[in-house]
UniProtKB/Swiss-Prot annotation:
This is Protein TfaX. It comes from the Bacteria. Belongs to the tfa family. Might play a role in cell growth during glycolysis. Disruption phenotype: Produces less H(2) during fermentation on minimal glucose medium, but not on complex glucose or complex formate medium. Alters production of organic acids when grown on minimal glucose medium; complementation was not reported. Transmembrane segments: none annotated. Encoded by the cryptic lambdoid prophage DLP12. The gene is tfaX. It comes from Escherichia coli (strain K12). InterPro entries: Phage_T4_Gp38_tail_assem.
Amino acid sequence: MLPQHSDIEIAWYASIQQEPNGWKTVTTQFYIQEFSEYIAPLQDAVDLEIATEEERSLLEA
């Protein structure tokens, strides 16, 4: 079993790009795209008023 929020860490590390000059940068667009996969279902549940209190708190965190 993976630790809580490990999928978020995976998305974060995947968004880091190695630049030709050796710098590592986070590509915001990729980061937002990855997180939208996790946020959209929670937002839909809140909008449809079927989210639990735990799900609401995850979205507000």
